[in-house]
């Protein structure tokens, strides 16, 4: 059975990116897939922690935080066959809560390599407004040596009809993962 780890980042409860992630997850459940989801943007005060490195010349070693990301999220991602990243667009980039979790991959680059990936983003702007993110995700995907299974860039997410169409695409993408 395929194991899937979903990471979302929006701090908006029931926001547009949550709707996309929910639809994707419903599609996954059609195939009884083993799913773990972490909503980084909806965590309490102090979660998630940012990457911290030891202060040693020539050494770039992360300082373990023993927080939720370290104890639960990273182990679930290490077990996962597919990693799904879902963000909202903030100032032409992924949001900070989401980025904080991605930065924590640093100590696990080798263990996380060669997985499959899905990326989804929503934004109130245009496709062009998401160009920087598209480059960022392409570079992350190459660096991690992940196989891209699909991408959805949901522009004009304020438009409920358009968002519903993107949510349907997310559902179908989730359903396609076996």
Language-model features: locations:
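Histidine-bearing beta->alpha loop at or near hydrolase active sites
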Residues: 156-158
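Surface-exposed acidic, glycine-flexible loop patches that form ligand/cofactor-binding
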Residues: 109-111
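N-terminal beta1-alpha1-beta2 submodule of the flavodoxin-like/Rossmannoid cofactor-binding fold
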Residues: 1-86, 92-107, 160, 164, ...
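Short, glycine-/small-residue-rich phosphate/pyrophosphate-handling segment
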Residues: 113-151
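Generic, ordered loop/turn and secondary-structure boundary motif
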Residues: 92-95, 113, 153
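Short beta-strand elements in bilobed, periplasmic/extracellular small-molecule ligand-binding domains
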Residues: 32-39, 146-154
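Glycine-rich nucleotide phosphate-binding loop and flanking beta-alpha elements
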Residues: 90-91, 126
């Amino acid at each position: 059975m395929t194991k899937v780890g979903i990471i979302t980042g929006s701090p908006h409860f029931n926001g547009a990116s949550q709707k996309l992630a929910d639809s994707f997850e419903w599609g996954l459940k059609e195939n009884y897939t083993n799913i773990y989801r972490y909503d980084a943007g909806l965590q309490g005060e102090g979660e998630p922690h940012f990457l911290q490195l030891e202060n040693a010349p020539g050494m770039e070693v992360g300082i373990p935080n023993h927080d939720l990301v370290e104890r639960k999220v990273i182990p679930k991602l290490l077990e996962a066959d597919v990693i799904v990243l879902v963000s909202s667009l903030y100032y032409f980039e992924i949001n900070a809560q989401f980025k904080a979790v991605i930065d924590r991959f640093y100590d696990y680059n080798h263990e996380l390599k060669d997985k499959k990936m899905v990326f989804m983003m929503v934004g109130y702007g245009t496709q062009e407004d998401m160009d920087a993110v598209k480059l960022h995700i392409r570079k992350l995907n190459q660096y991690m040596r992940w196989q891209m299974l699909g991408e959805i860039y949901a522009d004009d997410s304020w438009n409920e009809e358009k968002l519903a169409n993107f949510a349907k695409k997310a559902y179908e993408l989730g359903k396609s993962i076996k």
